[in-house]
């Protein structure tokens, strides 16, 4: 490269001005504006910048100090020649008098002796400044030095009110100002240790271009780099300015009045010493190593360029710009320690990735920031001499090119770090013969068990089961997803994993068990147990069965999406076994979203069936949101529809030919229910964007849908919170209306019908029926056979119609003598102490007709033959008729008490009385609408229990 003399430089500059006047004017305007802004910033922060020369100090002994004096005059920097005693405030307040910069009560002082010593210690600067024989050129070079210092101070101290600081000694302002001066002093020291010449920099740029000429997509860039103007030895060089600019990024923080104290301290003090020494070397070496690994050039000139550029880049701002990334890495690393102990180090890999890429990102980001701010460092030179013009051209022509190169290098370095993550995962999988991300889910599940062990162990007592079987769906994990995206192994990850664990009271860890769950084929087997009772609990929503496959597709230049394909299975088959089990399916996802409206509501969905084989035990099954097929097997089995808003029931067994078989239709109206949806996880690796589709449960609002359940070998059905319709079979049925206004028809058979809450209509039909209205004002019909009616306090006002048979009405929690019996029209009203009435319609109709119609012959028996109190005491229909007649349409309290006393003294009836007491107590303790969510083992009286007592009652 040819050398440039001062005269040739002037000639070249004149030609450049002639050929590119507009461009140079634009550059000059930018730089002058930068200088003006710098001056304003400095004036806002301090009274003035002063070059201090102690009285008696021989400036001639310095190497180039006279040039600095002339430059100070040229730049409007005041020169002091005073006694050192006037600087006491600087020494006492900041202890900076042994450094280049300090404070006085009149402004910021640049100490000439310290600067002179710096020039002596660093011959590069001294030799470059030269002697008095080339004073015109040296003034320009000195302008560059002082102009850079002036620029830094303008940024560093623009957030400080110096007048207030000096007058009030505000401690916060003092610390901030001290931090700024400490930083600037370190930066000037950095200049002395890293000065380079412009021609060396230009040579590095040119050679870098030659190394990049064969890189795909960068051919044009390499030509531009090699065709830069011949800059020669025009000045001290860009790297003096670059060294000064290492303070620019920190200045941005220090000058920001809104910045936190923590950030200002970090920018001004904590990192100031680090950026001068080992950090610069470490980051430079790291970036070079990454370039080698990425197949990029690392020759001497390129290494020198990187080292000199990183010297200005590794500033506090470079850390603060990516503080979140480093904090994230620290959090993930701390998080990873637990899972490493559980056999998964993916979180540590993720933390290392964020830390390494954070270092790269910090360096490159700050380099770009510093390059964009170079005009502040050369402002003085461009305004006062010819030296600034070629530097300005260099800034305008090269900054954008360097930025492009660095961005290209950054992505390559990111991908190299990602490749290391990829290789570690592949190496682990080869060694352990297992999917790495599945291991991640396994570790998450083990940690979950550890966190919830006390709760899970106590479930045995809460659910009254010898063994609790917990089925847990580990959901999509964002950190595992990030790792798959970074390593480009997105086709190997799954949406989660399901686990089966067993817990027994007294054990402090999950029990060894033979249970299994097969997601691909939709099989859950919990049948092999030697326990008498067990409770099956789906702890988290279980996704639908099927096998996932993924395909990674490139969407754009740097964007990829991994599409999810599912080979679905349309049902879960659950085998429970012979233990008496409680199984709750309400937390199983049975609906798959297919279509959405503009608001994101589900307007079309697909059904996933549950097929439950219960075995020989006495089982309780809670039905979920969609089609359920249940085979109860042997034992007394109950099916509950009492949880969730899963629609009103229409149960029809009128055509069934097998006992315990029912068809249950449900319309699940517009509401929220668990649906399986497809979501997208996004991760960015530099410029590379990765999207991964995965499944998740979503409690979405949906339009209505209809399902039909099929029940076999089921002894009891508990209804929903809606208005249900029950149509019984020709066999014995047990129905519980639950909440809502229910219509219950027992049809044939000896039925047990419970209305539950709400104003229900209950018809026992043919057979010997057991009828309980429950809360609400119910209408109850018993039919022609031997029926038992039950009422307790709080059940409301019930109307009973009976016709024939030997019937009984039991008040389960009221003594007979505390009731009031009245004739109202042709009906009998029985009133408890709360004022609730049980009205037996047409009780006296036949008698009234016989007394008013000649030769009338009774055709129907509309009376209930026995009315029973909570202690088993009773009154017969004949006694009621007699006492009502004697008491003028009401039984007196004395007459009723006598009936009770006479009954209690009858020894031959005592055993029967005890049996009836058990019957009434049993019925009184039962609430058909109870939600057994917290106690799946709660005792519910079965038809077998009740019928035994009914037979005793009838025998009486």
Curated annotation (Swiss-Prot):
**The record's note on its domains:** The Gly-rich region is probably involved in binding calcium, which is required for target cell-binding or cytolytic activity. The three transmembrane domains are believed to be involved in pore formation by the cytotoxin.
Query: Which UniProt key words apply to this protein?
Result: Calcium, Cytolysis, Hemolysis, Host cell membrane, Host membrane, Lipoprotein, Membrane, Myristate, Repeat, Secreted, Toxin, Transmembrane, Transmembrane helix, Virulence
Residues that span the membrane, as ranges: 238-254, 302-320, 383-406
User: What are the start and end residues of each Hemolysin-type calcium-binding repeat?
Assistant: 718-735, 736-753, 754-771, 772-789, 792-809
What is this protein's function per UniProt?
Bacterial hemolysins are exotoxins that attack host cell membranes and cause cell rupture by forming a pore.
NCBIfam families named among the record's database cross-references: RTX_toxin (NF033943)
A Gene Ontology molecular-function term? channel activity
Concerning PTM, the database record says: Fatty acylated by LktC; the toxin only becomes active when modified.
What membrane topology term does the record carry? Multi-pass membrane protein
Recorded protein name is Hemolysin
Q: Which family does it belong to?
A: Belongs to the RTX prokaryotic toxin (TC 1.C.11) family.
Q: Which GO terms describe its biological process?
A: killing of cells of another organism
- Alphabetical list of PROSITE patterns matching this protein: HEMOLYSIN_CALCIUM
Source species of the chain: Actinobacillus suis
Supply the InterPro entries for this chain. Hemolysn_Ca-bd, RTX_C, RTX_pore_form, RTX_toxin/Mannuronan_C5-epim, RTX_toxin_determinant-A, Serralysin-like_metalloprot_C
The GO cellular component terms are: extracellular region; host cell plasma membrane; membrane
Localization recorded for this chain is: Secreted; Host cell membrane
